[in-house]
Amino acid sequence: MNENHYLLLTPGPLTTTKSVKEVMLYDWCTWDVEYNTMVQEVRAKLVSLATKEEEKYTTVLMQGSGTFSVEAVIGSVIPANGKLLVCTNGAYGKRIVQMAEMLQIDVVVSQTEEWEPTNIVEVEKLLQEDKEITHIAVVHCETTTGIINPIVDVCKLGKQYGKVTIVDAMSSFGGIEIDIADLQIDFLISSANKCIQGVPGFGFVIAKRDELLKCKGKGRSLSLDLYDQWETMEKQNGKWRFTSPTHVVHAFYQALLELEKEGGVRARYNRYYNNQKLLVNRMGEIGFKPLVDEKYQSPIITSFIYPKEGFEFQQLYNELKRYGFVIYPGKISKVDTFRIGNIGDVHEEDINRLVDSIAKGAVIG
C-alpha cells in the first residue's frame, strides 16, 4: 500500500515510492560537480546491472522518453549503406520500423501476430536470403500485449551471421535478469520510468564500447547523436551536452539504491512474477482470460480479453479509478483487450484489492 492518489497499474510511468518522489523536492544545477558525479555513478550502476563483463560496456544517458533513446540508436548506429532487420509483433517494433523509414535507412521486417513471439525460423531465413542486412533489432518485452520475445535466440542468430544486435529492453531491463555480454547484445535501450522505478525524463543506452566507437560521425541528428552524447559524458565527467533533467536523475539514483536494497534484479523479478501470477489467477476466477499464452507471458504487463460482447472498457476504467486504480486500454487491432501492469511499487495486497474491486461490481453490474 502506498500514499499515491491513484495506484498506477501501468507499464510506465508507474507507481513510485515516496522516497523517490521526495528527492525531487529540491533544485539542482547541471554544472555542479556533485550532480555530475552522481551521473557517473548512475552510468556505472547501469553497466553493473547489465553484465559481469563491465569493462566491455558503457552507458549513455539521453534526455526525453525511451523512444528518443531508441531513435538515437537507430539514427547513430546504422551507417548510410547499412540495412536493418526489425523483428516486430507489436506497436514498439513497428515504431522502430517507422524510425528507420523516416531516417531513410533500408529496413526489412520479420512480422508475427501480436500474441505470438518472434519467429526464429523466419528470422534466420531472412538473414540467409538478404546478405545486405547489417543490423538486427528486437523488442524484449512488447508491452502492446505483454509478450516476451526470444532475445537469446535472436541475438545468437544475429552474431552467427555477423550482425550488430540492438535490443529494445524498455519494459524489461531491471525487472528481468539478463547479461548483455552473455547474450551478445551490442546496444540495449531502456528508460528511467520502467522496472528501475524512476520517473519519466530520460532513457539510456548500454552499449558495447567497440561498437559505440564505430558510431563517430554517423549521427543523423544533433540532439540524438549517441556518440557525441557519450563522448561529452566521458570527457567532462558526466556532463550532458544539453540541459539534463536534474530532478529525474536524482529520482533515478534513489530508485537504483532502492533496487539494490530490495535485493537486486532477481528479487524484483520475483515480486513482479508473483504479482502477475496472482493477477491472472484471481482474474480467472471472475471470468477474465489473458490474451498471451502463459509460456510467452512476461511479468511486466498482462492483456486480458474482453469478457463478453458489449463490455465497455471506459466503464471499467472510470469505476476502477473511483476505487483508486489506473489501468491501460488495449493496443491491438484484432482482439478487444485491456491491460494491467504488474510493475512499480506494487505488491500482492494491491493486486488483491484491485481484483476485489472488480469482483464487487466495479466493472460488470
From Swiss-Prot:
Reaction(s) this enzyme catalyzes, per UniProt: (2-aminoethyl)phosphonate + pyruvate = phosphonoacetaldehyde + L-alanine
Matches recorded under Gene3D superfamilies: Aspartate Aminotransferase, domain 1, Type I PLP-dependent aspartate aminotransferase-like (Major domain)
Coiled-coil portions: none
Keywords: Aminotransferase, Pyridoxal phosphate, Pyruvate, Transferase
One BP term from GO: organic phosphonate catabolic process
Residues recorded as bearing N6-(pyridoxal phosphate)lysine in the entry: 194
Keyword Transferase in annotation: yes
Disulfide-bonded cysteines: none
EC number: 2.6.1.37
Cofactors (names): pyridoxal 5'-phosphate
Protein origin, superkingdom: Bacteria
Signal peptide: none
InterPro entries registered for this protein in UniProt: Aminotrans_V_dom, NH2EtPonate_pyrv_transaminase, PyrdxlP-dep_Trfase, PyrdxlP-dep_Trfase_major, PyrdxlP-dep_Trfase_small, SP_NH2Trfase/AEP_transaminase
GO molecular function terms listed in the Swiss-Prot or TrEMBL record: 2-aminoethylphosphonate-pyruvate transaminase activity
Main enzyme class: transferase
Subunit structure: Homodimer.
Similarity-based family: Belongs to the class-V pyridoxal-phosphate-dependent aminotransferase family. PhnW subfamily.
Task performed by this protein: Involved in phosphonate degradation.
UniProt xrefs under PANTHER family: 2-AMINOETHYLPHOSPHONATE--PYRUVATE TRANSAMINASE
Protein name as it appears in the record: 2-aminoethylphosphonate--pyruvate transaminase
Organism field: Bacillus cereus (strain G9842)
Encoding gene per record: phnW
